[in-house]
Curated annotation (Swiss-Prot):
Classification via SUPFAM superfamilies: N-terminal domain of the delta subunit of the F1F0-ATP synthase (SSF47928)
Stated name of the protein: ATP synthase subunit delta
One example GO MF annotation: proton-transporting ATP synthase activity, rotational mechanism
A matching Pfam family: OSCP
Superkingdom field: Bacteria
Quaternary structure and partners: F-type ATPases have 2 components, F(1) - the catalytic core - and F(0) - the membrane proton channel. F(1) has five subunits: alpha(3), beta(3), gamma(1), delta(1), epsilon(1). F(0) has three main subunits: a(1), b(2) and c(10-14). The alpha and beta chains form an alternating ring which encloses part of the gamma chain. F(1) is attached to F(0) by a central stalk formed by the gamma and epsilon chains, while a peripheral stalk is formed by the delta and b chains.
Membrane topology term: Peripheral membrane protein
Function: F(1)F(0) ATP synthase produces ATP from ADP in the presence of a proton or sodium gradient. F-type ATPases consist of two structural domains, F(1) containing the extramembraneous catalytic core and F(0) containing the membrane proton channel, linked together by a central stalk and a peripheral stalk. During catalysis, ATP synthesis in the catalytic domain of F(1) is coupled via a rotary mechanism of the central stalk subunits to proton translocation.
Gene Ontology cellular component annotations, sorted alphabetically: plasma membrane; proton-transporting ATP synthase complex
Gene this protein is translated from: atpH
Database matches in PANTHER family: ATP SYNTHASE DELTA CHAIN (PTHR11910)
Keyword tags: ATP synthesis, Cell inner membrane, Cell membrane, CF(1), Hydrogen ion transport, Ion transport, Membrane, Transport
Family according to the record: Belongs to the ATPase delta chain family.
Localisation: Cell inner membrane
Amino acid sequence: MEVGIISMRYAKALMAYAEERGAEERLYHELVTLAHSFRTVKGFCAVLDNPIVSVNEKFNLICTAADGDHKPSEEFIRFIRLVLKERRETYLQFMSLMYLDLYRKKKHIGVGKLITAVPVDKATEERIRQTAAHILHAYMELETVVDPSIEGGFVFDINDYRLDASIATQLKKVKQQFIDKNRRIV
């Protein structure tokens, strides 16, 4: 079976189960943390794919990655036990991302990422969040990242769109125009 099909089936089943139990929001926060762990912890996927690591060790690792020192919800525990029992831990990252997408669509939550060369103050960040929420008619989750390599300006990713107003991109465009112009001369 394909990764997307398996992941979507598990995510839909988890969403239905969470709705039935009234635990959608808690599960959402646990899966946000788990998805963040997949992105930031090197080797996390490799450990889950490793057949030498026992199921109990994988279970404890996943629970720690999802909720840290706190005890995860009963719904999360049952879901992880099912995934491990069916030997689908390879797809867990995609299952969590699919669940997050389903939850955000259902609850009208937009996701944005603001990349700037210098830190942005809280007032500006909140104004951007409110403006995006007003335009999208949705609640906005906004992540801010400082990346000095853009040299100035900003890059704003929102739901699958990118607004790139960075100096680095503008300089690349000017450079490309000069290269194209010189090619015509030769």
